[in-house]
Amino acid sequence: MGAPARARQHRAAIARPAGQGSREGASPARPAQSDDQPAGPTGADAIYRKLFDSFDRDKDGKISQWEVLSRLQRSGLLPDDPRIQHALTGLRGVDGAPKQISFQQFKNLARHNSSLIQRAVEGNLAVPDFPALTSDIDRMYRELVPVRSGAVADYIPQLRRVDPEQLAVAVCTVDGQRFSAGDAQVAFCLQSVSKTVSYCLALDEHGTDAVHRHVGREPSGQSFNELALNPKGLPHNPMVNAGAIMTTSLVRPDLDIADRFDQVAATWQRLAGGRRAGFNNAVYLSERQTADRNFALGYSMRESGAFRPGVDLQQTLEFYVQACSIEVDAEMLAIAAASLANAGVCPLTEDPVFSATTVQSCLSLMSSCGMYDFSGEFAFTIGLPAKSGVSGALMLVIPGLMGICIWSPRLDEHGNSVRGIEFCRKLVAAYNVHVFDSLTTGRGRTAKRDPRRKKNQTQIEEVVALTWAASQGDLNEVRALVASGVEPGTADYDGRTALHLAAAEGQLDVVRYLLACGTDPQPVDRWGGTPLSDAESNGHTDVAALLRQVLQPAPEAAAV
């Protein structure tokens, strides 16, 4: 292939939209039917055939359950995912053993959720490179195990007896990709994490204005159980004890206390993808016996007229303590956090538990008030909505991406999990998930990784941008890319560099700049072509002369 043909081919490749025949192009986030794909059954058959062929490694027209299962698990979709359970069940024989299935059988099974399976196979879920994320999460988990500072909560007798060595980390993305490490199926009480759902339930039932006539939305700057109200005689926000008692009083006040509790527990179950939330009666009784401060807060709010008329204070406090005593495990809380990250829709069931505006309000207050009197520091260093509880639970929400639960009973002086805070620090150090990371990661290279991007996507885009700018003679863009950290001599799959393209197109200023950067003047592409041969073949004599001058040995060297 001659140099002009190579140059034309390369320009066509870098101009082609990603996903349309390019070897490394990034596919769109959601599969879309292309213009040339027939509509109706024929188009659907093409999608099913593409999926089937990706599993059929030995090309014998049959695939096994294990081929499908391993691919889905690698992408983060687990066998108990309700969206794919029907398909996985159909892949087993009558005796439960895996079976070989044909294309037609696969099509009958996959049609129950073909879009999800297709996105998983193509790497187009919320976190495309899920194995890399899970590897990092597992490493962070192992680094947390030796951390033993802090102490378990001792003002609630039952919590005092919890094993302080327990540790769990669980992750769930907005597409339902899941991973967990450690004691992720050990149940623990929600405690203050329950305040998030009580607030959301009150908002969905009464609306923002009505709820905030009874509770403020400013950080208190004080301890979570401080005997203090704002200047209007209202609790400062729904994330402190006084505020949570208030929002609890607003949840279905027309029902008796048993039905009100059932609604709260059922809501947690919906958020967690249908997994049943438990109740720790021992913790409830233990906390009820030591609830003098909460009673004092309740009487103080009643005296200031903060409650709606007719509130039964005794029943409200009982209801509040019951909500705190609901039990979940780390895997459930991660799914619940992912539901909040997904605008109130559970990723596993697609159940719209809360409205998007309700979740927006909740995440706003979690950002400013969710970590007790450490909330400001957490917002500054971590920059994500979170809610902690004295049981050692920490629910972290990355809006639009994932939810994370860290559970470790040892607490710091603020009442937050020591290991939970340390995990969050490690996470934001490794990934650009801080709310303001876009201000820094978009300007030059960074050690942080973007979990939303495909493996090698950044490097691919850098090569495309540099070679395209060089071919067009856009010297300012080439300079900007090099200044941001892009290696000027980087090559594409064919071994073509920016210098090849600039020489082939006669872009003398770009060639001169790349050479001044120390770029190799004679890189060889897969066809044996060099920048000099490209310039000569395309008749760019000025560029060819410059390259010969650079390649020609100095007179002293020639004499030797």
Regions found by a protein language model. Give the residues of each.
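Primarily EF-hand calcium-binding motifs
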Residues: 43-60, 80-100
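Structured C-terminal helix/loop/strand segments within mature extracytoplasmic catalytic/sensor domains
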Residues: 59, 68, 342-461, 465-468, ...
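Amphipathic regulatory helices of Ca2+-sensor modules
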Residues: 62-79, 102-114
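Active-site-adjacent helix/loop patches that line small-molecule binding or acyl-intermediate pockets
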Residues: 120-142, 149, 202-323, 339
